[in-house]
Amino acid sequence: MLNPIVRKFQYGQHTVTLETGMMARQATAAVMVSMDDTAVFVTVVGQKKAKPGQDFFPLTVNYQERTYAAGRIPGSFFRREGRPSEGETLIARLIDRPIRPLFPEGFVNEVQVIATVVSVNPQVNPDIVAMIGASAALSLSGIPFNGPNGAARVGYINDQYVLNPTQDELKESKLDLVVAGTEAAVLMVESEAELLSEDQMLGAVVFGHEQQQVVIQNINELVKEAGKPRWDWQPEPVNEALNARVAALAEARLSDAYRITDKQERYAQVDVIKSETIATLLAEDETLDENELGEILHAIEKNVVRSRVLAGEPRIDGREKDMIRGLDVRTGVLPRTHGSALFTRGETQALVTATLGTARDAQVLDELMGERTDTFLFHYNFPPYSVGETGMVGSPKRREIGHGRLAKRGVLAVMPDMDKFPYTVRVVSEITESNGSSSMASVCGASLALMDAGVPIKAAVAGIAMGLVKEGDNYVVLSDILGDEDHLGDMDFKVAGSRDGISALQMDIKIEGITKEIMQVALNQAKGARLHILGVMEQAINAPRGDISEFAPRIHTIKINPDKIKDVIGKGGSVIRALTEETGTTIEIEDDGTVKIAATDGEKAKHAIRRIEEITAEIEVGRVYNGKVTRIVDFGAFVAIGGGKEGLVHISQIADKRVEKVTDYLQMGQEVPVKVLEVDRQGRIRLSIKEATEQSQPAAALEAPAAEQGE
């Protein structure tokens, strides 16, 4: 009854299996894709009829990781998976971006793609597997889809590109780039890099696109074998007469409106023209559909702007194609934050702060691929007031998570190593105004705020958003695009990096025919823009401040013998707890004996270091210490001599005469000088008050820690 159709092929170092017809047979299409034990089950359901009045394409992509895939039970209170994590949200966006432009214009039926990770090999990331699965399922479904598309991850190790590197290989790689495309065109690039050149990045894109052709060929073969018949869907016929009538009423006026350089004023004028045009047409014929008129007006708007750009005329706000809007750069704008900056580019503005914390502020991420600790956090907030609107304020949306991750990628390559700068760093970008590329403004602001906070970043980084308009062989690359140009162009891409190279590259391409040469021109123009912005930023602050903020915790590092770690921690953590309370510091101990002491006050840190050195000091036989009586027994007394160490003064060693009763000579808590007679193999210490008193040398001052009193 179940007769699965399977295709197997070699993809780089992995074997990929596509299987359909076995599960979820009521879905429009379903595919199980596996790559060396990492398996993702992808389903597609498409509605045959569009909702009446639907004016946009309702595509939903859900990506969900199941912990059973890694043989684990969720650690949450309810012991089941909750809402999508940040990582799942980012992969859902990664699947969505290359498939969205492959649906035909005018197709507004609801489509839902659900990718479920059901098995995971910790060396094979499920994101590429899920992207291949979505492409295969849509191609099999019969839904109008101009695919299939492939997907590949590209690494760069020892000056060689590596296809789909394993997780271990990625740690050695200077690049982590995901590229997706069809047979003829690249559609999407998402990457982070350790400051590689434009040519190296472009080479990786081309390499990934060439290598993924095997995926596309195999999906096509599977479709021949198991594909469902294509839907008989036709786009609505174009009403030429109505288009001409709308153009006659509005085209010239819209062209004039787009010469207004102020965003709010321009929007107001465009709204007036649209509403007047629609009112005029509805007065002539009330059977017309207002939504359809709105769409025609939008298409006219798009053509007005595109044709002006292609004709070499100034852009919407009066700039030439490679001009960047006016920049205003300020640092140290908030008095109590550890680092802050206000970065303004035209009508886009970001208030960015940097906060320093200790290792215990790091985020522990319990991911499917295993647990990891993140010591660099980047959060991006996009409040509705930034575009002059009202709206919900609450937990971050998909877009904010995606933009925050892109900005983080832009900065990650220049962050110092933990051994040189042992702080957890959190950067928050508040977008206070937005008109184009707020994520790249966040990169610039983050670089400034980190320098202001005294974080020794390896270089300043800046980001820029670029656009491309293409008609036939004629194309124009635009630097620093506005929000309006973003929607009207054929490709938009964002590049972040330093003077030396690229740290992050994100591309979204909506058309075919974007060649390697065009991408080369675009990347080189972006480099010029990036260097210009870096020049302006350097006038405000050209190197990290020599010292961190007085309000930031200072971390002092000392080394102790790993065998002594247990002494510093104490029984059940008693010693370290008492130390942190006594000194007002935060103390972290690593397995190799590295001790990090964080304090906002230098004196407190010195006190903590002194106490730890006392605790870890070796007990010297023959030396006299100041001790404190902690326990009295019939045969003598136990005396703490600091460092959590306790020794026995035998009754015969209390005085130089016979002692009948210990309490005649000693009381609990009494401070007495003691001489170390012996430390045996088991670390037990024999002490003498008698010999210490006889000896005239001054006692070595070593106080017992508070935790040891009254034990």
From Swiss-Prot:
The keyword Ion transport does not apply. The keyword GTP-binding does not apply. This is Polyribonucleotide nucleotidyltransferase. Component of the RNA degradosome, which is a multiprotein complex involved in RNA processing and mRNA degradation. PANTHER family: POLYRIBONUCLEOTIDE NUCLEOTIDYLTRANSFERASE, POLYRIBONUCLEOTIDE NUCLEOTIDYLTRANSFERASE 1, MITOCHONDRIAL. One of its GO terms (biological process) is mRNA catabolic process. It is an enzyme of class 2 (transferase). PROSITE patterns: KH_TYPE_1, S1. It catalyses: RNA(n+1) + phosphate = RNA(n) + a ribonucleoside 5'-diphosphate. It is found in: Cytoplasm. Belongs to the polyribonucleotide nucleotidyltransferase family. Its cofactor is Mg(2+). GO terms for cellular component: cytosol. CDD domains: KH-I_PNPase, RNase_PH_PNPase_1, RNase_PH_PNPase_2, S1_PNPase. It comes from Escherichia coli O127:H6 (strain E2348/69 / EPEC). Keywords: Cytoplasm, Magnesium, Metal-binding, Nucleotidyltransferase, RNA-binding, Transferase. Mg(2+) binds at residues 486, 492. GO terms for molecular function: 3'-5'-RNA exonuclease activity; magnesium ion binding; polyribonucleotide nucleotidyltransferase activity; RNA binding. Its EC number is 2.7.7.8.
